[in-house]
């Protein structure tokens, strides 16, 4: 949890926003997935948002569903994902690592056991995509017991009550949704979300990172100009993996070429 605090403090000092890529662990296989993550960090990623492949990804658009299927095809299991997380943490001791996942996976381990495992491998935050704030008590209590930040999604139509709850229960960062619907780079992010950002700040929420439909540097800049602390990009990155699936080296070069200008756009 503290890794987010120190990251946001450092970025503030440098007058920068955060650029956070999302990928699915184990896509397209364990070895290449670890290389992908190293490449994202080398290219300027400030934090990581990682998916654990699971059979029923509700909020995911087709691009990220395909990533899940590729990881399954490679035989990747949740247990192996935790081994990968431990390796990533060893190699990159300071970068904040967040998981974005679904409740079934948490339940299949047992809620407390799941967060205990997160703490053990050095995961900083968990966003359970299909658990709304009002049903989140057992998840967020277990998370806090194990020093893991519970992350909540703030939808574009959030009312005042919801904003207060998100501010009160969330830690680490707030996932600010560009728009409703499923993830995907082809659905460009609709801005501005200034009024939500203003309210979240007023209620002392964790810093907002804008996600969903972020696929170009101008959108990263627009999110930060609207008051977000940074931006999360998933489908656009996963699409690059898909496009270069048979050329692992070219894939890494293309990922680097995508991330560098996205990170550059966070510098005012």
Swiss-Prot record:
Its EC number is 4.2.1.20. Keywords: Amino-acid biosynthesis, Aromatic amino acid biosynthesis, Lyase, Tryptophan biosynthesis. It is an enzyme of class 4 (lyase). Pathway: Amino-acid biosynthesis; L-tryptophan biosynthesis; L-tryptophan from chorismate: step 5/5. Signal peptide: none annotated. InterPro entries: Aldolase_TIM, RibuloseP-bd_barrel, Trp_synthase_alpha_AS, Trp_synthase_suA. GO terms for cellular component: cytosol. The active site is at 49 (proton acceptor), 60 (proton acceptor). It catalyses: (1S,2R)-1-C-(indol-3-yl)glycerol 3-phosphate + L-serine = D-glyceraldehyde 3-phosphate + L-tryptophan + H2O. One of its GO terms (molecular function) is tryptophan synthase activity. Tetramer of two alpha and two beta chains. The alpha subunit is responsible for the aldol cleavage of indoleglycerol phosphate to indole and glyceraldehyde 3-phosphate. Belongs to the TrpA family. This is Tryptophan synthase alpha chain. It comes from Escherichia coli O17:K52:H18 (strain UMN026 / ExPEC). The gene is trpA.
